[in-house]
Design a protein with these regions (language model features):
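Positively charged n-region of N-terminal signal peptides that target proteins for export
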Residues: 1-4
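Tryptophan-anchored aromatic micro-motifs
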Residues: 25-40
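Bacterial signal peptide processing site
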Residues: 18-20
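An anionic, turn-rich surface loop/hairpin at beta-sheet edges
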Residues: 75-99
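Hydrophobic/aromatic beta-strand elements that line small-molecule binding cavities or substrate pockets
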Residues: 44-46, 63-67, 89-96, 117-121
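N-terminal glycine/threonine-rich, aromatic-flanked beta-hairpin/loop signature
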Residues: 41-69
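Short, exposed beta-strand-loop hairpins at the edges of beta-sheets
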Residues: 55, 103-114
Length: 123
């Protein structure tokens, strides 16, 4: 009988607890973002709306389609590729979310090339 009371108390405790974690990872699907300049590349400004991403880096402006698989994985593809490399999709995995930024890893096509960086939400 005593064992049954402990089991019931445990079940009630576990089911009555409210999670304090709020998943608002969707906040990175639209807005204005920035990737700071780093070793070998210039600052990049990104504008995301619906299924389009406009990327400005240096004097170059590119338009990409963006397809979200879930809140932590999306695919980018150049709408008007200028090189053979730009014809391959880019697979982006969000690794860690911060207040207004996230760390990600990008893989180009089916190559072994990966790059890690951080995106900051500006607006």
């Amino acid at each position: 009988m005593r064992k049954l009371i402990f089991i019931i108390a445990g079940v009630l405790t576990l089911t009555s607890c409210k999670s304090e974690f709020k998943d608002n990872s969707d906040r990175f699907k639209v807005g204005v973002f920035e990737i700071p300049a780093g070793k070998g590349f210039v600052k990049e400004t990104i504008i995301r709306k619906d299924s389009i991403q406009i990327s400005q880096h240096g004097d170059h402006v590119d338009t990409l389609s963006i397809k979200w698989k879930n809140s932590f994985f999306y695919t980018l593809k150049y709408i008007n590729p200028k090189t053979a490399l730009q014809e391959d999709p880019m697979y982006v995995q969000i690794n860690k979310i911060h207040n207004d930024s996230y760390d990600f890893t990008v893989k180009i096509g089916f190559s072994k090339f990966t790059q890690k960086a951080t995106v900051h939400k500006v607006k």
